[in-house]
């Protein structure tokens, strides 16, 4: 009985050892460059932009604010602080767009959204939430540049 138990224990332990295989496509250098954990993930801050309280801005003011908003997005992306940005389609929640910031804390993200003229002018309000996602998201902009004609 003792021999059967030890054999079963050995088989179970061997099964556990071999089930912990490393992904053969794993690129340690890339993972380190993206600050990926062992799952290929990292922490970001997710931001939802919602319609703000400023309903009195003129068309010209809005145009200037949106130009500044887009310029700010471009700057943050070039700095590596913003890995994803884009508008929502029309919806009943007053959601206008999203940002995913390549920072670890809400405080860092607050400092970044404070540089957006449309947020400063209350055209947009923001909700910030810590988010855990693929570290590969940081490569999205490089790919986007290759598929954008204009």
Model segments located where?
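Bacterial Sec-dependent N-terminal signal peptides
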Residues: 1-22
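Conserved, structured core segments of small domains
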Residues: 20-150
């Amino acid at each position: 009985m003792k021999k059967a138990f030890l054999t079963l224990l050995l088989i179970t332990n061997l099964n556990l050892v071999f089930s912990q295989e490393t992904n053969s496509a794993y690129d340690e250098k890339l993972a380190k460059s993206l600050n990926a954990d062992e799952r290929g993930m990292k922490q970001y801050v997710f931001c939802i932009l919602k319609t703000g309280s400023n309903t009195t801005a003129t068309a010209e003011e809005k145009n200037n604010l949106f130009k500044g908003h887009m310029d700010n997005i471009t700057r943050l992306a070039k700095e590596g602080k913003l890995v994803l940005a884009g508008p929502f389609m029309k919806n009943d929640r007053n959601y206008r767009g999203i940002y995913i910031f390549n920072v670890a804390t809400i405080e860092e993200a607050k400092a970044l959204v404070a540089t957006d003229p449309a947020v400063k002018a209350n055209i947009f309000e923001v909700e910030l939430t810590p988010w855990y996602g693929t570290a590969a998201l940081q490569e999205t902009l490089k790919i986007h540049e290759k598929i954008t004609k204009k």
